[in-house]
Amino acid sequence: MKKVILAYSGGLDTSVILKWLSEKGFEVIAFVANLGQKEDFKAIECKALSTGASKVYVEDLRREFVTEFVFPALMGNALYEGRYLLGTALSRPLIAKKQVEIAEKENAAFVAHGATGKGNDQVRFELTYAALNPFLKVLSPWKDIEFLKLFKGRTDLLAYAKQKCILTRATIEKPYSEDENLMHISHEGGKLEDPLYIAGEDVFSWTNSPKNAPDEEVFLELHFRSGLPVKVVNLNDGSTKEDPLELFEYLNRIGSKYGVGRVDMVENRFIGIKSRGIYETPGATILWIAHRDLEGIAMDKEVMHLRDMLSVKFSELIYNGFWFSPEMDFLLSAFRKSQEGIEGKVNLIIYKGNVVPVSRFSPTSLYDQSLSSMDVDGGFDATDSKGFINIHALRLRAHNLVLRSRDPFGWRRGIIDAEIMGKGV
């Protein structure tokens, strides 16, 4: 019998896929990834077995997710399209990696997932399979003609589940879809597909509304070594966390309580479709802001600016599913080098949705207070600035001399179209 390793969540889609594959003659081994989502994993295991799985792997991947995926992404200041911290995108290559490992252990020739043909996840799963074991065959039912003839949408899935006695809590009227892991929870679909629709508090399941957050701020002290968070201290009550997983979970609790990390955005999917997503990413938001602030005092200017250019590509590669790729190896190596001197601590105020760095210290600080002072010379010869400016002005003077008769900057007088401005909205 042909073996297939199915990435199984226990939800409607993957339960139907499990049964469908089983009835097509596959021996289905279900793989359930514990990435920190609030689920009853024993119940999911029992459901997989009752639906037709021959075996179930339930793997606790929380620590690996934080240390091998989330922290490296934060080290590279990953932020897709300036807003999305990539919680879902970072989890998929880890799930797919474990699928490949189980397939090799079980001598399975196939791997399968339940991602749709419109989304990003199908790409993330399948690029990871290709990178780690190109000999595995991929079963993607939502791109299979036979499957698509049977299942046009949610109604057909529910009818099939009822017919096959598959237990499900799903209903036809599902307000939106969610993806949850230790890093974030996302909300998409349903009413949220209308960009004019204003999401109410019923959408958010992790974070308090900032207006309902505590009136007293909390002071945190975050410590970093080589760009990685190694300790958090709550200066209000003295509590401390140093274990990576415990540290991240603690920041999630603090951030959720204070309404940190909410993002409502329209993003560009890899396949070309625009999609609205609402994200709650409390702990990672706190870490991202603190890490960036410490870099300000401890990272060389040119290294920072070069890294910032690379961070845009880094974020795209994560989003598009290229975690296991030669270009990602290159970037991760470069970022690791850039973080060698990022050591020290940042003090933050967390208050009603805001994360505000208020002080920072680094033993490898490149900040010279005497040089920066407005009141003290500090060994800086101000007359040197004259030559510095003259050198940088050389090409601007040359540009003007060559193009003077053509009014080189005249076009800017119409850069703001008065007619458009006058029309309002």
Curated annotation (Swiss-Prot):
It catalyses: L-citrulline + L-aspartate + ATP = 2-(N(omega)-L-arginino)succinate + AMP + diphosphate + H(+). Its EC number is 6.3.4.5. Its main location: cytoplasm. PROSITE patterns: ARGININOSUCCIN_SYN_1, ARGININOSUCCIN_SYN_2. It is found in: Cytoplasm. Keywords: Amino-acid biosynthesis, Arginine biosynthesis, ATP-binding, Cytoplasm, Ligase, Nucleotide-binding. This is Argininosuccinate synthase. It comes from Pseudothermotoga lettingae (strain ATCC BAA-301 / DSM 14385 / NBRC 107922 / TMO) (Thermotoga lettingae).
